[in-house]
A protein has these predicted regions:
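Conserved hydrophobic residues forming the short capping helix/wall of the S-adenosyl-L-methionine
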Residues: 1
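Conserved SAM-binding strand-loop segment of SAM-dependent methyltransferases
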Residues: 4-17
Length: 174
């Protein structure tokens, strides 16, 4: 931003979404909606609506679960919620669309990156395994190794099968 001479035109704030005050022309939220939790998604979208200026746009990057799996998923703790990301929750597109609409926002576009993210996870897993000796020397044991190898493989398979997706979507305040 500074190198491009935009520091007088752009204000970046890294903060908890619940602490936002004022109106913004643009809001970006990158892979944090998963940490909001099922019970707080309505408030998350309400906060975006409240803080987005008229005609303002928000860009969200989120990991989502396929609509056909959502009902089972939302009522049962999965491996990631139990061992990796307690309290995490993947929304589905249908619920996102409902929250967006209920808050007077409009989705402009959805872009899927599931295949790209599957490839990224494969690279991360391979790099993790290549660097295992360095990691082990920091005090991590074989249980940790198996857990993370499984986690990365589990996620890669989820993206490849389209059971989960990495989406970017933009929405606008009507």
């Amino acid at each position: 931003i500074f190198k491009c001479g935009l520091n007088e035109k752009v204000n970046i704030e890294i903060k908890d979404y619940r602490d936002l005050k004022g109106k913004y022309n643009s809001i970006a939220s990158i892979e944090m909606i998963e940490a909001v939790g099922q019970n707080y998604l309505e408030g998350y979208f309400k906060t975006i609506k409240t803080n987005l200026s008229d005609g303002g746009k928000a860009a969200i990057q989120a990991i989502t679960i396929d609509d056909r799996l959502f009902d089972r998923y939302k009522n049962k703790q999965d491996f990631i919620q139990k061992y990796i990301f307690p309290g995490g929750f993947l929304p589905n597109k249908n619920s996102i669309n409902r929250y967006v609409s209920d808050n007077g926002l409009t989705v402009n576009s959805y872009i899927s990156y599931a295949d790209h993210y599957a490839n990224t996870l494969a690279i991360w897993r391979n790099e993790f395994l290549k660097k295992w000796d360095l990691i082990k020397n920091q005090g991590f044991d074989s249980t940790f190794k198996r857990m993370w190898e499984f986690y990365l493989s589990y996620c890669e398979a989820g993206f490849k099968s389209k059971n989960i997706d990495l989406i970017q979507f933009s929405m606008q305040n009507k």
